[in-house]
Amino acid sequence: MSTKPSLTLKRRFNAPPAKVFSAWTDPEKLKRWMGPGEVKTLIAESDPRSGGRYRIVMRSPDGEDHDISGVYREVIPNEKLVFTWAWKSTPERESLVTISFKSDGAGTLLTLTHEQFFDEAARDRHQQGWNGSLEKLEKFVA
């Protein structure tokens, strides 16, 4: 049995867990930072409860739209989010994202694990995308 590729990213933010968590669950806040580099989030919908759904539509600089959606599997306010992640273009390639938010003095230690990728190329693209998004989140919550 082969294991599907995964990635784990850790980052410290100079903001309390409640502020960082809210940036992930409030649609208006999500629009301000989600997406790497010059990618813009056009649509953000979020119902952050177990069984609730979310949807994000991002537009890349070339004008192409990227539609992602999923279901929240676990929501512990200011501590943990677990949700499925599927691109509209390849819904059969659903993956799973787990984010933990831990208090660190006046800041937050965030650990993002994204697993069950279709292949290593998909993992590598997502790693680049998540790193770019987390850089924007860092500026947003500062």
Task: Give the location of each predicted region.
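Hydrophobic ligand-binding cavity/cleft-lining segments
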Residues: M1-K40
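Structural motif
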Residues: N14, V75-P77, D104-A106
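Glycine-rich portal/gate segments that line the openings of hydrophobic small-molecule binding cavities
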Residues: L42-T84
